[in-house]
Amino acid sequence: MLIRGMKGLGDCIYQRAFIRQLRGPVFLETPWPELYQDMPHVRCVRPATELRTQAKNIQRHAKWVRPPSGLGTLNIRYGGAGIYNGMRSAFRVQPGVLDLPGFGSPPVTGRYVLVRPVTVRAEWRADARNPLPEYIAAAAAEMRRRGYQVVSVADLQPGHEWALEPLPAADVRYHAGELPVEQLLALLQGAAAVIGGIGWVVPASIAAGVPAWVVCGGQGGYNAPELITDRAMKTSQLTFAVPDNFCRCTERQHTCDKRIANYDQRFAEWADRLPAVV
């Protein structure tokens, strides 16, 4: 079977739950073969992509497999019905466990929180989805006040991807894509908590079982919590901060109302539930 899979990092994490249910061999087009290293029935096929971070990871690898001719093909997509519901239809199976391979020791020691700043990509702008950057910055500052290290991760490049101010204060910054995906996910797996907006940190946090504070922005027609999570996932460690007037649009650029009342208090209550730094 040839699977023309989703290409985003987050989508490729979600896919794991379905691909593990398929009988092998499975020939999978993916920019992120690292995510399937613990699945011996998966053969990774080089995909075509023009997106910067995907192409950069593809260039790291040489051992791509050429699928045999005549294979049946599944094209994986999802729409407004939700990520897992769309994948159920595309894969034609129910999901298994959503997890990650073990990626070893993180590049940072001690008690730390992983923070994903708010960024904009020129090649795929999703301004409406982004939360207000001051909410991420406030959360990072509060965690530093509580004694945690803050580690901020991004892959910024002038003219291609940039962060929105205010940037979260951080003890360690990897903002130039220094971490390959294995180290990035090892960093997440070793974190005391994760803070960020909608994106790859959501499925990665669920898969790793790490507490996550996820700040929603807009574009709720695709990115509402109930659409990016599912009853089949273990989401007890996931907390969403949702705008009071959550916009259910499906536009990537729209002036959604992203304000959240009593945000600082709500975040402090969430942080109080984390184990104290000693």
Residue ranges, per PLM feature:
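Catalytic machinery of carbohydrate-active enzymes
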Residues: 1-278
